Structure formats: structure tokens, C-alpha cells
């Protein structure tokens, strides 16, 4: 694949189709020059695996996504040589997002503009003070694809987003929203977090957490915003196909199972349907048509193999069960603790297919006992190979395990306070927060519960709980304090290990409150060490109450606090 050229030039449709044809011939062919059956179009195979395809690259969309990277580079580094050269030639008085093709444009510039148009579709403003964002023209709603809200007839012609905020810039002006924006977009705007301390608007890529352009996310966007009708996925249950790619087995077995579910095997029934043959009779039993379910499960030969294998799931040999039900039962065995059950059923399918081809094309009969023995041998060899590779990998470069928290709640340093917080959310109700405050001896000095705003993700819910607990602790005059939660993603964001464009305003507010403390740290702990705060967050508040402070230990967290105290003392 000419990736280097595709980074700079927009390939013609004819070249893309020619390359697609070469790739398709390689995929469906057997390595020789003979003609081969293309069971599905390349467009259908190019669908993501989660949508039932095989995830091959659709070259035109991939080409545009690669070209978009050049536009992003110019936006990120406007003073680099390439950016300065193009600006001087094509857009001296504006920026690349508003540049036009102009006269006598080079082929490279025409290509870059096609990538620029894709970047435009995925750019979104994160509203800060709103002074740079035009409410009716700039893309600032976090929807797919990003867009401005739809305005009503009463709305002024030109409105900056700052005019939609209240006087303190801490929330939206609901009166203006209801009057100027159509109702279906009002709720979307109200769910956008604003921060009073924000001093500028931020532009980022909507389709990644970091807000940074990636070819992968841009390719997905190009695939899902095309003017052409999207291709139909190949036949078969998409949810069951997703299970295929999670199987711990050989890649060739995964693709074989995909072809089985998609109806892309050369069974007699399929060949007759495509008018390649008129005889669909099973060559083993000569009693029924050779359908996929008959070949692998219902034929006397296949039933003998499955009975000899002793697979404990009765669905496998149940003649009334569907093909999807049988395969689902086999896939579920792949998570079995027994190696025998994990691998053998999948290799039995493979060996039944191989023995069928030997019979049809070489006129050699392989007994069911031999087929079963070969399947067991394949399964054992594959598992032994995997074990050897894992042992080698662990010895040479051990993979870091999942992050482990401390075994018990820990007291803060002398002179510091620790506040454990947690959030609880539901789809249609405002999120809730719970927090527990303890001193450097582990003594309880307070706890709180509060109801916040409606949040759209669990991450937003956790950050809101942190903000509420910070506000409360600051109001009580604490100077040096640790805030400890159980969300690893939030911990990475707070400590600068991973940026997150989607919660940027929440992060702005956290950092603004952090500056008010003399000393402030953000810590992570395992969920079991955060049980008191978790229990408070899940506790329902009485109707009409949005905040409760507990001077004494609430009954709902008494046992968990006692356990924390006991373990930390030990």
C-alpha cells in the first residue's frame, strides 16, 4: 500500500480501485494465478470488525484521512517551513481552515485541501469564555458530527457563545437558550460544562479523548460521513462476529469462523445458490444438502466426531438448534478454565472442513477417529506454542500487570487531611457525590453527600464529585489535603499522564480550586478502599435535599469505616 504517497497526494479513483482489486484477489485467492471467487465486495469487507466486516482499509477514505494529518500539522506548528511556505503561496491573509484553492494551484495543495475538509468536520470548540466562538457558525456542540446549534427565528443574526452565558460565566443563561435555540439542541447545550475561570476557547479533535487528530479516528469519520450509501455488512449476527475476534485461538481459525458465519464457505448449498453447481448433496452421507450446519454438526460423520470429543454442551449435537446457537455455545467454551475445552471445539470445526475438502477434491476418505485425533493434536500444539511464547515474553520483558492499589486505606501524612470521594450516576437523574474526611490519625472529622448536575459519562460524574468535595473542604478551611478516588482514568488526567479533551472544562475547574489550597494532592486507591465514599454516593437523598453534611458517622458507612481503621492500624 503506497502510504507515503497517500500522505501527500490524493490518489485517483481508478488507482484506488486497482489497488483494492489487487488486495481482494490476494485475500480471496490461493496464491496462484487462477481466478477466485470474491464472496463479498471490498466495500463490505472494509467495514469495521464490530460492524461485521473484516476491517480492511477503504483506500479513498484512508487517503483523505492521511492527508488530513498535513492540515493538523499546519495547525499545530504554524511556524514550520511547510506551513510558512504554503501560507505565503495560498493563504497569506487567513488561516488554512478558511483557505481557498486559488488559481494555478499545485496538485499537492489540491490534495491537502481535501484532507482539510475532513478535518473541518471533526474539529470542535471547547467553550471557555466563549468570546471567540460564533454560536451559529462554529462547531461547538459535542455531537456526531460536531455542529453549531439550530437557532430560532427570534435569535439575533450574530451571537457569540459568551452572550449565552450568565453574568458570572459559571452557567448558561437558560432564558436566552430557550428563546434563541431550538428545543432539541437546548438540552445538548445545557449539558456542556462551562467554567467561570476559563480565559480562552479551545479547539480540538472531537473523535479522540486527547483532542489530538489521529488517522484512525479520521478514517472512521470519513467512513461514516460519506455522501454515498454505506455498504451492507456481510450476512451473519454482528454481535456473534464480535465474539470471534475475542477468541484466544489462531488467527486462521478466527477468519474461518467469520467465513462460516458469513456464508463464505464453498459448501454445496452455497455453490448451487451462486449457480456454480446444480448438485448440492452432501458427499459423505448422500442424504441431505450440504449446508453449513449440516456439514459441521448434523451430518452423521460430524455427529460422530462431536460425540467422540465429549463436549459437555448439548447444543452442539442438538439437531434442532440453529447454527448461531451452536457457534455461540462453542465460543463460550473458549473462556473455560480447561485447556481441552478452550481449544478443541474450534479445531474440530477446522479439521471437519479439511477432511471434507480431502474427500471432495482428492477422493480420500478420512475416518472420524482420525479427524478427531488431528484436531486434538492441533489444539495441543497451538496451546503449547502459546505457553512457550508467554513464558519467553514474561522472562525477557515482563508485562506490567494491572495497577494495584494499597491493600487497605492509608492515613495521610502528618498535618494533612485526606478526603475520599466518589460519584454515582444514572441516565435520567442528576449525579450524586459522596465524600469522607479523615485526619492524619485516621479519625473521622466529617462526611458529605450532594446532588450535582446531570452528567453524560461516568468520568464526568467522578470529576463533579471531586469538585463538590473540593468546594466543601475549602469552605471548612483545610489547608493541606489529599483527594483520593478510585477512578484510574481520572487519576491519569489529574496527574498529567493523559490529556482528555472531552472533560477539559471540568479539569479547568478542578485546577482552579486546587490553587486555593496551600497543599493539594490527587491520589488513586482501589475500589475496596473507597467503600465509605461509594456507599454515601449511592445513598438516596431525601426529597428536596441537595446537600447534607454529617458531623457524626452516618450509619451506612459505620462498618466500612471501622474496617478501614482496623486495617490501617495493622
Q: What is each of the regions a protein language model found here?
A:
Residues 1-570:
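A helix-boundary/hinge signal
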Amino acid at each position: 500500500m503506497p502510504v507515503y504517497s497517500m500522505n501527500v497526494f490524493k490518489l485517483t479513483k481508478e488507482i484506488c480501485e486497482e489497488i483494492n482489486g489487487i488486495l481482494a484477489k490476494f485475500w480471496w485467492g490461493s496464491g496462484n494465478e487462477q481466478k477466485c471467487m470474491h464472496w463479498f465486495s471490498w466495500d463490505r469487507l472494509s467495514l469495521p470488525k464490530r460492524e461485521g466486516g473484516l476491517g480492511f482499509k477503504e483506500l479513498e477514505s484512508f487517503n483523505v484521512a492521511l492527508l488530513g494529518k498535513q492540515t493538523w500539522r499546519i495547525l499545530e506548528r504554524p511556524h514550520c517551513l511547510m506551513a510558512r511556505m504554503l501560507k505565503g503561496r495560498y493563504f497569506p491573509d487567513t488561516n488554512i481552515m478558511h483557505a481557498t484553492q486559488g488559481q494555478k494551484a499545485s496538485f499537492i495543495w489540491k490534495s491537502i485541501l481535501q484532507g482539510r475538509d475532513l478535518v473541518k468536520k471533526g474539529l470542535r470548540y471547547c467553550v471557555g469564555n466563549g468570546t471567540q466562538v460564533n454560536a451559529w457558525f462554529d462547531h461547538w456542540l459535542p455531537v456526531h458530527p460536531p455542529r453549531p446549534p439550530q437557532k430560532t427565528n427570534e435569535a439575533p443574526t450574530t451571537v457569540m457563545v459568551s452572550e449565552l452565558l450568565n453574568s458570572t460565566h459559571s452557567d448558561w443563561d437558560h432564558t436566552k437558550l430557550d428563546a434563541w435555540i431550538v428545543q432539541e439542541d437546548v438540552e445538548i447545550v445545557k449539558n456542556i460544562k462551562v467554567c467561570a475561570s476559563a480565559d480562552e476557547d479551545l479547539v480540538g479533535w472531537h473523535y479522540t479523548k486527547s483532542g489530538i487528530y489521529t488517522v484512525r479516528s479520521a478514517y472512521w469519520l470519513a467512513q461514516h460521513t460519506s455522501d454515498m450509501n454505506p455498504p451492507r455488512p456481510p450476512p451473519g449476527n454482528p454481535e456473534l462476529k464480535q465474539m470471534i475476534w475475542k477468541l484466544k485461538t489462531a488467527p486462521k481459525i478466527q477468519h474461518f469462523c467469520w467465513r462460516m458465519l458469513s456464508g463464505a464457505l464453498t459448501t454445496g448449498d452455497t455453490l448451487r445458490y451462486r449457480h456454480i453447481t446444480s448438485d448440492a448433496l452432501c458427499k459423505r452421507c448422500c442424504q441431505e444438502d450440504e449446508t453449513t450446519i449440516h456439514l459441521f454438526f448434523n451430518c452423521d460423520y460430524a455427529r460422530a466426531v462431536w460425540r467422540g470429543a465429549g463436549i459437555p454442551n448439548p447444543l452442539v449435537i442438538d439437531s434442532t438448534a440453529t447454527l448461531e446457537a451452536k457457534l455461540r455455545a462453542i465460543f463460550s467454551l473458549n473462556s473455560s478454565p480447561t485447556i481441552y475445552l478452550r481449544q478443541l471445539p474450534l479445531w474440530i470445526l477446522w479439521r471437519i472442513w479439511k477432511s471434507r475438502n480431502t474427500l471432495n477434491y482428492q477422493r480420500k476418505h478420512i475416518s472420524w477417529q482420525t479427524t478427531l485425533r488431528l484436531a486434538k493434536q492441533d489444539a495441543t500444539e497451538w496451546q503449547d506454542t502459546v505457553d512457550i511464547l508467554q513464558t519467553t515474553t514474561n522472562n525477557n520483558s515482563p508485562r506490567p500487570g494491572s495497577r494495584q492499589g494499597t491493600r487497605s486505606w492509608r492515613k495521610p501524612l502528618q498535618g494533612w487531611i485526606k478526603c475520599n470521594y466518589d460519584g454515582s450516576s444514572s441516565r435520567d437523574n442528576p449525579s450524586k457525590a459522596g465524600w469522607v474526611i479523615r485526619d492524619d490519625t485516621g479519625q473521622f472529622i466529617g462526611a458529605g453527600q450532594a446532588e450535582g448536575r446531570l452528567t453524560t459519562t461516568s468520568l464526568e460524574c467522578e470529576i463533579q464529585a471531586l469538585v463538590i468535595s473540593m468546594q466543601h473542604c475549602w469552605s471548612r478551611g483545610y489547608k493541606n489535603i489529599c483527594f483520593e478516588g478510585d477512578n484510574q482514568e481520572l487519576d491519569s488526567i489529574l496527574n498529567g499522564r493523559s490529556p482528555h479533551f472531552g472533560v477539559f472544562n471540568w479539569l479547568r475547574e478542578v485546577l482552579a480550586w486546587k490553587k486555593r489550597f496551600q497543599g493539594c494532592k490527587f491520589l488513586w486507591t482501589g475500589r475496596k478502599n473507597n467503600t465509605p465514599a461509594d456507599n454515601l454516593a449511592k445513598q438516596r437523598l431525601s426529597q428536596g435535599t441537595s446537600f447534607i453534611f454529617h458531623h457524626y458517622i452516618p450509619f451506612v458507612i459505620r462498618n466500612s469505616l471501622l474496617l478501614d481503621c482496623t486495617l490501617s492500624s495493622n
